[in-house]
A protein has these predicted regions:
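Auxiliary, metal-adjacent structural segments of Zn-dependent hydrolase domains
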Residues: 2-18
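Walker A/P-loop
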Residues: 343-345
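Accessory nucleic-acid engagement/destabilization modules that flank
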Residues: 1-2, 11, 23-326
Length: 345
């Protein structure tokens, strides 16, 4: 039965109207309100990392990458998959401002699949392959046109490594990361505008025939953007990013703190989810189960089976969905993670 409060012996201020009283007290933040309220940029970090994760490996849909997974292509990459991912995303953005492309992405009923590979929008770099082969640097016009798209594109193209100025074209045995030998002032004043394909991967042979680049830009099958599961997640993130643009857009591209942590979340999520393989019965481990997609022909990675042979592991669609979810979880945990870091104070 229930008791009725008649009188209080002691300090009545310690009791509520029903006679309940706390039996203990703590200075710890049990409700963890500080986690949610102290990080004003946490929402932007989470949403940007999540959208970049949905985009980061789209370039793995290329014929060249799928052939490499099957062991049919062993030469050094001419174009890395993250650069193809960037170009695919920018083809979707087109000439729109941030609000326009986010509104298109927020409509999960419209796949907009054609615009991702429309020849008029999908610019395919073929560096050093002859006159007229150069394509405009991706960030040159994007910085003013759609700064949020530029920030997302930066996360996509840097999820493995940061751009590096390529060695001089006259150098022999050119490799990515070799010393440039000179420095240009605009790299400090406008660091993104000059970034081109060879900042991501150097073409060792400047005489590479144009046809050799084609498998890197031609898709081996439908992009994951055509799948409802992908569009649903992308639309959800796009709607949140649209809200962050209210009442006026914020310059996230120049917020180094946000970009650095969003990139950290994306890279950690990518490494984590890529490490998830099969259980002892040859089935996807439990952590993968919510994201496994059936009837997929494009894959993101491989795994050794029990006989020591390489087999397809995560489908490309599964990988994008899983990494996006992991990036969201990691970014959500950042405020709590901070408390466990060593500090001077």
């Amino acid at each position: 039965g229930h008791s009725e409060l008649l009188w209080v012996v002691g300090d009545a201020r310690q009791f509520n109207a029903e006679g309940a009283v706390p039996t203990n007290a703590t200075a710890r933040d049990i409700l963890r309100a500080d986690d949610e309220n102290g990080w004003h940029s946490a929402e932007a970090i989470r949403r940007m990392a999540r959208l970049a994760a949905l985009l980061h490996d789209l370039g793995k849909a290329s014929q060249a990458f799928q052939q490499r997974l099957k062991g049919e292509r062993n030469e050094r990459n001419l174009i890395r998959h993250e650069w193809v991912s960037l170009r695919l995303f920018l083809a979707f953005v087109g000439e729109d401002g941030d609000r326009q492309w986010l509104e298109r992405l927020s409509d999960e009923t419209d796949a907009n699949e054609a615009c991702w590979t429309d020849p008029a929008r999908y610019l395919c770099d073929k560096p050093g392959s002859g006159p007229g082969s150069a394509t405009p640097p991706p960030f040159a016009s994007l910085l003013q046109q759609a700064p949020l798209a530029a920030a997302i594109g930066w996360l996509v193209v840097t999820h493995h490594r940061l751009p590096a100025a390529p060695p001089a074209s006259s150098a022999t045995n050119r490799r990515w990361g070799d010393k440039r030998g000179c420095f240009e002032k605009n790299w400090l004043t406008d660091p993104l505008t000059a970034i081109a394909c060879e900042w991501n991967e150097v073409i060792s042979n400047p005489q590479t025939p144009p046809k050799d680049f084609d498998p890197y830009w031609r898709m081996a099958g439908p992009l994951p953007v055509a799948a409802h599961a992908w569009r649903k997640q992308a639309a959800r993130v796009a709607r949140h990013l649209l809200k962050l643009q209210q009442p006026q857009p914020f310059d996230w591209l120049n917020n180094i703190w946000v970009l650095h942590l969003a990139r950290l979340c994306l890279m950690l999520a990518d490494h984590h989810y890529s490490s998830l393989g099969m259980d002892g019965e040859g089935r996807p481990v439990a952590a993968r189960q919510p994201f496994v997609q059936s009837q997929q022909k494009l894959f993101a990675n491989t795994v050794f089976d029990r006989t020591g042979r390489r087999q397809p592991c995560q489908s490309l669609l599964e990988h994008l969905l899983g990494v996006s979810d992991s990036a969201a979880q990691i970014s959500h945990a950042l405020p709590g993670f901070e408390r466990h870091l060593p500090r001077l104070a």
